[in-house]
Amino acid sequence: MIELGPVTAMHDHPVEELRQALDHLRLALMSAGRGPHHMTGMVWTTTAPALFDLANPTIDLAYREVFAGFRPPIEIEMAPAGGPRLSIRATVARPAPLPVGPLWRGYDLPTLMREYSPRGQVPAVAPIFEHYREEGAAFLGAHAHREVAYGAGPRERLDLLLPSGIAEPRLHVFIHGGYWQAMDKGNHAQFTRAFLEAGYAVAMLNYSLAPEKPLDGLVAEIRAALGFLWHQAPALGIARLPFDLAGHSAGGHLAAMAVATDWAALGLPPDLIGTATLLSGLYELEPLTHLPMAPLLALDRISAHWLSPVHLPRPSATRVLLAVGGLESDEFKHQTALLAEAWNVPVGRHRIVPDRNHFTIVDEFAEGPLALAALANAAP
């Protein structure tokens, strides 16, 4: 057992102060050859505990942006007067011996972890996330919208944006990523720009984040949200026509699971999802069972199989467009290729987007050739 820290940050805003301090701790973990899953405890020493309360959703999201769902027990202690407003230290376990040999497609564990770590492939990711937050807030600030509850949970919410001057528009639904453990609908509203400007209504979905719910629970929430939107369409001012659905990263997985759903068995139209764009998603989950995140998702080999879209029947009622960034890892490209093969997606609707990584491909979806392709795919 070792102790890392204390780490501090100086910023006027407590959320950004926490985010920067946690990122310093993340770098210290990396330097020590450890990861977030090795942390056994944290101590936050602060002069203002109320400012860093993880019960505050904004603080919770800032934590998750750095460490996702990995959260050891956290002790809060008062700092002496005159010290930094926040300092953080962590106790870290000795790494367990690594399994020997290949685990998936010839990859050993360290290589597999790198392949499935988009953050590790994009060193300067913090400015990208800041761009997400700022652009999302600006987009929502510039467009009338309302938050609607589709379920009882605190994150079972959606933001609904309606185009001006169009009665009962068709609906475009977007599901954000974050490895099922992080991010928020408000960080992603800007990526629906092309659809809103084309006259679609837009629903931005939030959902519970692991480990507060396992992955199958998140799939159920997305299905519930889509059913809610169909049943409430007249009251919400949207058309009862097949939806267009999009999802990025973990949201791509959740969107694919929705596409593969037997909607008729749930008392809904079989073509509830008419068209879908799946961006840099995860469609074969077996390799994730070897990674430290698996327990957070309650994912084992059995659940990974039936939660993998590649093992579900090919949807006949939905026209699917697949895209992945040209700068993404071989495994993320392979994930998209697997679904294209399993679902017999035509070559013209399976795209590798040049010069885009896992986090910037959504910019291309907001405006650019990928946006035009998604709109063409969604056209009746």
Task: Name what the model sees in each region.
Residues M1-G101:
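Short, polar/acidic, helix-capping and beta-turn segments at strand->helix junctions
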Residues T111-I166:
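N-terminal cap/lid segment of alpha/beta-hydrolase-fold proteins
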Residues S164-F195:
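Short, surface-exposed "cap/lid" segments of acyl-processing enzymes
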Residues L171, L196-N206:
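A fold-wide structural signal in alpha/beta-hydrolase
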Residues M183-T192, A203-P242:
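Catalytic nucleophile-loop/oxyanion-hole region of alpha/beta-hydrolase
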Residues G227-L291, A304:
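Primarily recognizes the serine-hydrolase "nucleophile elbow" in alpha/beta-hydrolase
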Residues P269-P270, T275-T289, R301-L338:
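The feature captures the conserved acid-bearing segment of alpha/beta-hydrolase catalytic domains
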Residues K333-A337, N344-P380:
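C-terminal catalytic histidine-bearing segment of alpha/beta-hydrolase fold enzymes
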